[in-house]
């Protein structure tokens, strides 16, 4: 009966969980090249302090979404050369199909051994017993966890246990065109929403932009609610900006951070500072519009900075900068994608557990004191990461310094927070919330009515579970 229930649950959650996802790097960075031969970090020896080698031959499948497959295969080849008793068979699915495919495999009792996971699916998959906690079986995970940005560790933790080692992690960043900002007479980006309003108003008055602010807040954009939540987090010191410890809505209280953001959004929209097209804009069009100089301010996943500042991409290449999220706390949303293993590994016995842990050490952990594979993704493909020591790595600084300010990137990572309320019903509620936020911005309902409707929907879905 439990399996049938899970299968039914999976179908009901199908569309909502996909749409709530932030797709990078499943579909990003937009212009990420196929991997070339890795720099020195790629050809590393076996991980130190690894679990005992498998006694016999072990073959495991590894399921990923379709991004950077050349790099993944090359990393597998290197891992197998160092661990000749272990064979890894790679299988990939598109990001758009990934969640449903994995859920279908799990519900049919045909899971992979190893796979990519995500913070917004962890509650669903771990509560069903499909994934197993890595810190229970792999001795080095605790050491890795101590060096991971808090938001990423939180995103890989369920019921106090760690279920992943980070493959990719990123933050929602406040970005601005420094050349246009200076044209408006400002030398520093806004630190608060009031300053952002003032600067945008001046830029419009001087004819720098018709609409100084642009967001990619189409209801189909997974990054839309994360960007909105980042603004909310930035207005509050500490947690529980959205939900309290009992998962009760906190966002619809008088004077809440969410209410402040909704009122501000309504103001900048009604005064012509926020481009009305924001409510139907997709991320790719957001990047193009910013490159064309049509707007000065935006919020987007950090990986877009590499595309914005790509040489010869436009008149403003090299002029885009990252600022802290405007607000008293400057907190933002961070998200994580990670390597995970299923119960199938444990059921297969000690040799498989040992091999899987060696895999985790090599792909998401350290090799001779270096996060080898994570560093390779960062240097070659510009992917964000959660392993804080890499911010001090000379190769990473050189690579990221081509399109961003590394100290600011690190500061965002340390202040970022995982989304609140990541439950099995979060995805479907998230879809509902997107429409309500837009109604509030458009003035179709008051800010508090929109937030109250979001709270009522949350309570309804929570009760149904």
Where are these regions (language model features)?
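Conserved C-terminal helix/tail region of periplasmic/extracytoplasmic solute-binding proteins
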Residues: 37, 47, 87, 182, ...
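C-terminal lobe and pocket-closing loops
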Residues: 53, 304-315, 328-431, 463
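Short, well-ordered beta-strand elements
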Residues: 55-67, 86-91, 113-114, 163, ...
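Extracytoplasmic/periplasmic solute-binding protein
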Residues: 158-167, 172, 197-249, 266, ...
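Hinge/lid segment of periplasmic solute-binding proteins
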Residues: 44, 49-53, 119-172, 197, ...
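Glycine-centered hinge/linker elements that transmit conformational signals in sensory
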Residues: 200-201, 246-279
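Extracytoplasmic "Venus flytrap"/periplasmic binding protein-like
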Residues: 77-148, 157, 179-191, 288-297, ...
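Short, low-complexity disordered leader/linker segments with a strong preference
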Residues: 1-61, 81, 138, 449-465
């Amino acid at each position: 009966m439990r399996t049938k229930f899970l299968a039914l649950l999976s179908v009901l959650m199908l569309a909502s969980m996909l749409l709530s996802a932030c797709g990078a790097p499943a579909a990003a960075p937009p212009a990420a090249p196929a991997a070339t031969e890795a720099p020195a970090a790629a050809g590393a020896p076996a991980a130190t302090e690894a679990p005992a080698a498998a006694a016999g031959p072990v073959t495991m499948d590894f399921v990923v979404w379709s991004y950077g497959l050349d790099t993944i295969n090359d990393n597998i080849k290197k891992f197998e050369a160092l661990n000749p008793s272990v064979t890894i068979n790679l299988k990939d699915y598109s990001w758009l199909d990934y969640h449903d495919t994995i859920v279908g495999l799990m519900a049919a009792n045909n899971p992979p051994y190893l796979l990519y996971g995500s913070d917004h699916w962890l509650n669903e998959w771990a509560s069903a017993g499909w994934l197993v906690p890595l810190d229970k079986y792999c001795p080095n995970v605790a050491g890795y966890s101590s060096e991971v940005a808090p938001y990423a560790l939180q995103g890989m933790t369920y019921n106090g246990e760690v279920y992943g080692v980070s493959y990719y992690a990123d933050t929602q960043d406040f970005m601005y065109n420094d050349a246009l900002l200076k044209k408006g007479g400002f030398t520093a980006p806004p630190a608060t929403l009031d300053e952002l309003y003032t600067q945008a108003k001046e830029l419009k008055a001087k004819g720098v932009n018709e609409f100084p602010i642009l967001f990619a807040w189409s209801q189909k954009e997974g990054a839309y609610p994360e960007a909105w939540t980042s603004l909310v987090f930035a207005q509050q010191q500490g947690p529980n900006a959205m939900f309290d410890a009992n998962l009760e809505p906190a966002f619809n209280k008088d004077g809440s951070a969410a209410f402040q953001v909704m009122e501000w959004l309504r103001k900048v929209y009604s005064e012509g500072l926020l481009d009305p097209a924001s409510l139907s804009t997709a991320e790719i069009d957001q990047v193009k519009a910013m490159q064309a100089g049509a707007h000065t301010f935006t919020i987007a996943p950090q990986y877009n900075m590499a595309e914005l500042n790509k040489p010869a991409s436009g008149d403003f290449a090299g002029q885009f900068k990252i600022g802290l999220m405007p607000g008293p706390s400057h907190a933002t949303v961070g998200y994580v994608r990670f390597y995970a293993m299923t119960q199938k590994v444990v059921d297969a016995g000690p040799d498989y557990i040992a091999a899987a842990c060696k895999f985790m050490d090599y792909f998401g952990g350290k090799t001779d004191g270096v996060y080898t594979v994570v560093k390779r993704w960062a240097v070659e493909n510009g992917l964000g990461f959660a392993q804080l020591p890499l911010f001090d790595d000379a190769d990473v600084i050189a690579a990221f310094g081509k399109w961003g300010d590394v100290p600011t990137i690190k500061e965002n990572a340390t202040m970022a927070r995982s989304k609140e309320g990541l439950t099995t019903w979060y995805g479907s509620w998230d879809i509902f919330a997107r429409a309500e936020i837009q109604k509030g911005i458009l003035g179709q309902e008051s800010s508090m009515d929109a937030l109250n409707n979001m709270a009522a929907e949350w309570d309804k879905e929570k009760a149904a579970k």
